[in-house]
């Protein structure tokens, strides 16, 4: 059964750990993440970008697949199915499709319009028992063709959005999607501390979790980050393991070309990455 992310993130905030959001791209990705969460007794959030939703034949297909897999795999840990960086229209599509959590990314709107649209979605989500994430300050890098510069959020604007009643808030603190460049300055902990002070008990979200050093992850959690998003790292691990399998000629031996065999090393690589992150975030055994 899918659940809202509200309770798991409130527990994480109170317990000084973070829940991982791992983005899914297909059945193999979903299975690997769910099995690892169950094995480690950790709550988990499955993230779906609008691009990935389209790739997987629509949000309803995704929601139905995830619900069926939770039953088939006998998953008992809390699982939230979450729209990642949703447009206003995308949020409504996911609500209709049966997602348990949505993110409205209004960071590219003027703050007044971001507030107006977020307020409306807060009302709808709360009526349906769904969790809602909002964003202030664009996250850097590229996400489904949208390029952000890696801004630092204005703590006062963060409070304005938090006060609308969202479940969690993603504040830009110099983080970016994808690989971090060699000259990256690191997370702005001054910004994070100021935002945390303004929003109080609200769980904060760190996007672009790939490539952030472990000490910075731990410091971010100590300053109120309760949800950390990981996508690129799983993609890189999957690609490297698949490449190794093919370059070793294993696809040419026996039935090694069978997609179930060809994709297996990549799936194991995703599991290893998810396990490493859950241990780092402190969510193991917290289901």
Q: What annotation goes with each model-predicted range?
A:
Residues 17-25, 50-54, 261, 265:
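A short N-terminal beta->alpha junction/helix N-cap motif
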Residues 245-258:
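Active-site gating loops and adjacent loop-to-helix segments of metal-dependent hydrolytic enzymes
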Residues 83-86, 268, 272:
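A short, hydrophobic secondary-structure junction motif
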Residues 173, 208-210, 232:
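Active-site proximal loops enriched in glycine and acidic residues that flank catalytic Cys/His/Asp
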Residues 21, 199, 213, 259:
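Metal-dependent phosphohydrolase cores
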Residues 3-15, 27-52, 57-76, 85-202, ...:
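Alpha/beta enzyme core
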Residues 19-23, 81-82, 103, 204-207, ...:
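Short catalytic-loop micro-motif centered on adjacent basic/acidic residues
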Residues 255-271:
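Short, flexible active-site recognition loops that position polar ligands and cofactors
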């Amino acid at each position: 059964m899918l659940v809202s992310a509200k309770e798991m993130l409130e527990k994480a905030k109170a317990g000084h750990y973070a829940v991982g959001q791992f983005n899914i791209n297909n059945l193999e990705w979903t299975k690997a993440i769910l099995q690892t969460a169950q094995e480690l007794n950790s709550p988990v959030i499955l993230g779906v970008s609008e691009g990935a939703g389209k790739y997987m034949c629509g949000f309803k297909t995704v929601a139905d697949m995830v619900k069926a897999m939770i039953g088939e795999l006998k998953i008992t840990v809390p699982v939230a199915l979450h729209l990642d960086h949703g447009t206003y229209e995308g949020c409504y599509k996911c609500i209709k499709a049966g997602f348990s959590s949505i993110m409205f990314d209004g960071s590219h709107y003027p703050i007044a319009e971001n507030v107006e649209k977020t307020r409306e979605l807060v009302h709808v989500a709360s009526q349906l028992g769904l969790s809602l994430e909002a964003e202030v300050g664009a996250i850097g890098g590229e996400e489904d063709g949208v390029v952000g510069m890696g801004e630092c959020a204005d703590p006062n604007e963060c409070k304005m959005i938090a006060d609308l009643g969202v479940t969690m808030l993603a504040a830009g603190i110099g983080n970016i999607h994808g690989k971090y460049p060699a000259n990256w300055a690191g997370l702005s902990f001054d910004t994070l501390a100021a935002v945390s002070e303004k929003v109080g008990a609200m769980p904060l979200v760190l996007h672009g979790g790939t490539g952030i050093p472990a000490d910075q992850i731990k410091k971010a959690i100590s300053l109120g980050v309760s949800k950390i998003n990981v996508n690129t790292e799983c993609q890189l691990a999957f690609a490297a393991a698949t490449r190794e399998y093919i370059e070793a000629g294993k696809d040419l031996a026996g039935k090694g070309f069978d997609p179930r065999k060809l994709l297996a090393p990549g799936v194991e690589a995703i599991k290893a990455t998810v396990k490493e992150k859950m241990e780092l975030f402190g969510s193991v055994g917290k289901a």
